Amino acid sequence: MKTAYLASLVLIVSTAYVIRLIAILPFFHTQAGTEKDTKDGVNLLKIRKSSKKPLKIFVFLGSGGHTGEMIRLLENYQDLLLGKSIVYLGYSDEASRQRFAHFIKKFGHCKVKYYEFMKAREVKATLLQSVKTIIGTLVQSFVHVVRIRFAMCGSPHLFLLNGPGTCCIISFWLKIMELLLPLLGSSHIVYVESLARINTPSLTGKILYWVVDEFIVQWQELRDNYLPRSKWFGILV
């Protein structure tokens, strides 16, 4: 009898979590787009602009071209993203951090908090080296993500990602938190695919397409031929 009760309890809990998982993964309930979406910053980035509280935004910088694209995106939408905002800046190399620090000086009203993330995988790394760095990144990023996510509670917030594989780990932890702590609500993860990806998505894009709340591409061909659930607003960076 006790075994039957335990089995029933496990079944109920498992079913509840499966339903919750379906609810938090937008892929299951987002329709494919067929036309160009309206280039409206509020709709594009899923921000409740009417809120009186300052926006809390997490931005992750990759390196090189990814950093350049993210900075241009922030600059193009500065009125929406950088107006009296609190910016949580994740980075994996010092050059990107310095570049962002120089850029953000123009917006003295923004508060910035910096978080260094290990790279999920180094270029030309062996399989063993990749496994080692991925495990280290998982542990370190978990601490950062939990701290940042709880700091955002009660305020309009956004996780804006672009580029490297570390974005997958960050998104993974955010969705785990949504699954286990439903009262936290949505993390509002937006991934912007690189301008360089015209016909096929990046490896990071292929993974995050199934996970993030909003997946944005910058070329119609990519949306129409490969990623029908994505949004296309034209060139953003």
Curated annotation (Swiss-Prot):
Present with 339 molecules/cell in log phase SD medium. Residues 1-7 are lumenal. Keywords: Endoplasmic reticulum, Membrane, Nucleus, Transmembrane, Transmembrane helix. The chain crosses the membrane at residues 8-28. Pfam families: Alg14. The keyword Transferase does not apply. InterPro entries: Oligosacch_biosynth_Alg14. Signal peptide: none annotated. Residues 29-237 are cytoplasmic. GO terms for cellular component: cytoplasmic side of Golgi membrane; endoplasmic reticulum membrane; lipid droplet; nuclear membrane; nuclear outer membrane-endoplasmic reticulum membrane network; peroxisome; UDP-N-acetylglucosamine transferase complex. Heterodimer with ALG13 to form a functional enzyme. Involved in protein N-glycosylation. Essential for the second step of the dolichol-linked oligosaccharide pathway. Anchors the catalytic subunit ALG13 to the ER. It is a single-pass membrane protein. Belongs to the ALG14 family. GO terms for biological process: dolichol-linked oligosaccharide biosynthetic process. It is found in: Endoplasmic reticulum membrane; Nucleus membrane. GO terms for molecular function: protein-membrane adaptor activity. Its main location: endoplasmic reticulum. This is UDP-N-acetylglucosamine transferase subunit ALG14.
